[in-house]
Amino acid sequence: MTGSQDVARQFDAVLSKLLDTTKASRTTLRIDIPALGFNVNDPAGEATRPGEKSLRGETGINQRTVETVKWLDRERRPLIQDDLLTAEVPAPAALIEIYGARAQMLAPVIVENAMQGWISVHYSTGTRSWSATDTAALDAAVSDIHAILADIAD
């Protein structure tokens, strides 16, 4: 099995590509892989623009109780939010107030019919209409994460 640092580097590479493609402010992967010490309450992977606050090590929120995460688990499809201040599914207040996110895309990572984790794409410059290119990049990142998970399962 691959070590957790190696896997985290692979996750970070996927998220860096997603950050560049979408021109977002921050991308994260939260995922449960107990054998590697990964838990959804602390990002297993992250990429940020200079000046953006990292979410790594910020474990004060039980992520699975957050409304957006419950929506992902129920719907099993991406959640695209152009304006977090008026979003129908509320994002955590800290994401907006402390980390400055104003728009986001979230996509579940489903393994064996369970939501093992999710990818987040945050934009902090203002509201944003996410494009088809942006959502395709998110879908591709989920596929890349699935490929990494398949490799470490072998």
Please state what every model-predicted region is.
Residues 4-20, 25, 32-35, 93:
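Short amphipathic alpha-helical segments
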Residues 16, 20, 28-60:
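GAF sensory/regulatory domain recognition
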Residues 42-48, 68, 115-118, 130:
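Tryptophan-centric aromatic hotspots in well-structured domains and transmembrane helices
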Residues 50-97:
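Regulatory sensory and allosteric helical modules in signal-transduction proteins
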Residues 102-110:
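A short, aliphatic-rich beta-strand micro-motif
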Residues 109-123:
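Sensory-domain boundary capping and coupling elements
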Residues 123-141, 148-153:
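Regulatory loop-to-helix N-cap segments in sensory/regulatory domains
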